């Protein structure tokens, strides 16, 4: 299974409760504990300027798309062993679809 369009309101709630502590969405908001997510889709792993990524993130070399995020967000440490992202993941497909749909809209 892969990504399918989700609920934006539920995605916003997930972002607020699970992601906003470490990530920003809008251009110019900058990095926090985690890298800024503005321009996320189409970007390569480990490529946000000014953020201190692990070598694992820099060397993964994939492009962030709906499908790569769908897999990554289920279990970040499994997808990129050595990442410093301290998030256990979203196990439910629906939650990942909701969050990715929201991120697609808000990070453009």
From Swiss-Prot:
Subcellular location: Mitochondrion intermembrane space
Gene3D superfamilies: Cytochrome c-like domain (1.10.760.10)
Function field: Electron carrier protein. The oxidized form of the cytochrome c heme group can accept an electron from the heme group of the cytochrome c1 subunit of cytochrome reductase. Cytochrome c then transfers this electron to the cytochrome oxidase complex, the final protein carrier in the mitochondrial electron-transport chain.
Post-translational modification: Binds 1 heme c group covalently per subunit.
Principal localisation: mitochondrion
Stated family: Belongs to the cytochrome c family.
Keyword Acyltransferase assigned: no
Superkingdom of source: Eukaryota
PROSITE patterns, per the entry: CYTC (PS51007)
Protein name, UniProt field: Cytochrome c
List of residues binding heme c: 19, 22-23, 85
Annotated Gene Ontology cellular component terms: mitochondrial intermembrane space
Pfam family, one: Cytochrom_C
InterPro entries per the UniProt record, alphabetical: Cyt_c-like_dom, Cyt_c-like_dom_sf, Cyt_c_1A/1B
Keywords: Electron transport, Heme, Iron, Metal-binding, Mitochondrion, Respiratory chain, Transport
GO MF term set: electron transfer activity; heme binding; metal ion binding
